[in-house]
Amino acid sequence: MKAARFAMHSARSLSSVGLVPREVELFSRYSPSPLSMKQLLDFGSDNACERTSFSFLRQELPVRLANILKEIDVLPDRLTNTSSVQLVKSWYIQSLMELVEFHEKSPEDQKNLSDFVDTLIKVRNRHHNVVPTMAQGILEYKDTCTVDPVTNQSLQYFLDRFYMNRISTRMLMNQHILIFSDSQTGNPSHIGSIDPKCDVVAVIQDAFESSKMLCDQYYLTSPELKLTQVNGKFPGQPIHIVYVPSHLHHMLFELFKNAMRATVERQESWPSLTPVEVIVVLGKEDLTIKISDRGGGVPLRITDRLFSYMYSTAPTPVMDNSRNAPLAGFGYGLPISRLYAKYFQGDLNLYSLSGYGTDAIIYLKALSSESVEKLPVFNKSAFKHYQMSSEADDWCIPSREPRNLSKEKMAM
């Protein structure tokens, strides 16, 4: 316990004065090693070897943490000096230092393996509030200084990479904990958090019902679901893929919430609500899910903002010291959902018809061998993204009143 308190104090002290341990410099020189869904399954198969997973993670997790710590250091000083970002940085440094302690420990010793699982659980719990805490840091920064378009673009670039890094480290830790922990709490048909035969339609229906319950509570009404499935790969059979059900549920739940809200608010005076229509199609390479509503859509000028962090129609939340910090109001629903889709080489896009409705489309890889982690790496190319300077726009900006060329000719 004393060692843990000392590590936490040291991490905060180093972070507060802008210093990082030499271990961060060391591990940031390595690039992360992306895993495919198939490789993750192999780690958790019947022949899974805890020692192999231990040996991989004690190297890989510090590499991923160190890479993103280096990226935090190139952010504007006023941002990195906020109390929230300092706190996040101290968590990452402490976690890295705790994981590095296992580098010299033998994987043949069962106690080391058990201690490693305990450490992963501790790290995962420590990072529980990373998303809202970093979001609070961005808000603190924006409250103290004006953010120009170039800086805003850099923040968007950083947050995409920071949260993708978090998704990936959490995925690796969860896999090891669920498979090798003494307390088996996962679904017995899953390998860790991965379902080898994920029933896509079942996840869609579950996410819809969860959203419907919220909609009923708030609006006292909700639209129905109209679902169509097309299995172009194996006609007539149910649609199954290798995937992480919790990731898919997260994406669908967010999209259904938006679709239901738009539908109810747009059609409150209509005799009945139009259904939210979903079509799910399995092809040879991709699984595609399209969610369509008639909620009125949004103008083109707003569409791009929907995937921008900090854009939200909900009131800005207030952080407290509880472990249940809110995310609603930070504007993170859609951008985080898109990251979940992109994590295994998929995507999430919105197509809106202003005055009619919106189509939201999720693309996922149909083959587990092609579902490979999409990971940020801090290198010269990434560094350049943060060194961009604000330059004059090279496109004409229309004036409110067109120039009167006839008067200019007379003046000449």
Curated annotation (Swiss-Prot):
Transmembrane segments: none
Tissues and organs where the protein is expressed, per its UniProt entry: Detected in skeletal muscle and heart.
InterPro entries: AK/P_DHK_N_sf, BCDHK/PDK_N, BCKD/PDK, HATPase_C_sf, His_kinase_dom
Chief location category: mitochondrion
Family annotation (Gene3D superfamilies): Alpha-ketoacid/pyruvate dehydrogenase kinase, N-terminal domain (1.20.140.20), Histidine kinase-like ATPase, C-terminal domain (3.30.565.10)
The enzyme's E.C. designation: 2.7.11.2
Pfam family, one: HATPase_c
Residues of the Histidine kinase domain: 138-368
Biological processes, Gene Ontology terms: cellular response to fatty acid; cellular response to starvation; hibernation; insulin receptor signaling pathway; reactive oxygen species metabolic process; regulation of acetyl-CoA biosynthetic process from pyruvate; regulation of fatty acid biosynthetic process; regulation of glucose metabolic process
Induction: Up-regulated during hibernation.
Localization of this protein: Mitochondrion matrix
EC supergroup of this enzyme: transferase
Residue(s) at site: Interaction with the other subunit in the homodimer: 157, 161, 395
GO CC, alphabetical: mitochondrial matrix
Domain of life of the source: Eukaryota
One annotated GO molecular function: ATP binding
Binding residue positions for ATP: 254-261, 293, 312-313, 329-334
Family annotation (PROSITE patterns): HIS_KIN
Keywords noted in UniProt: ATP-binding, Hibernation, Kinase, Mitochondrion, Nucleotide-binding, Transferase, Transit peptide
SMART domains named in the record: HATPase_c
Record's catalysed reaction(s): L-seryl-[pyruvate dehydrogenase E1 alpha subunit] + ATP = O-phospho-L-seryl-[pyruvate dehydrogenase E1 alpha subunit] + ADP + H(+)
Self-association state and partner proteins as the record states: Homodimer. Interacts with the pyruvate dehydrogenase complex subunit DLAT, and is part of the multimeric pyruvate dehydrogenase complex that contains multiple copies of pyruvate dehydrogenase (E1), dihydrolipoamide acetyltransferase (DLAT, E2) and lipoamide dehydrogenase (DLD, E3).
Family membership: Belongs to the PDK/BCKDK protein kinase family.
Function: Kinase that plays a key role in regulation of glucose and fatty acid metabolism and homeostasis via phosphorylation of the pyruvate dehydrogenase subunits PDHA1 and PDHA2. This inhibits pyruvate dehydrogenase activity, and thereby regulates metabolite flux through the tricarboxylic acid cycle, down-regulates aerobic respiration and inhibits the formation of acetyl-coenzyme A from pyruvate. Inhibition of pyruvate dehydrogenase decreases glucose utilization and increases fat metabolism in response to prolonged fasting and starvation.
Protein name as it appears in the record: [Pyruvate dehydrogenase (acetyl-transferring)] kinase isozyme 4, mitochondrial
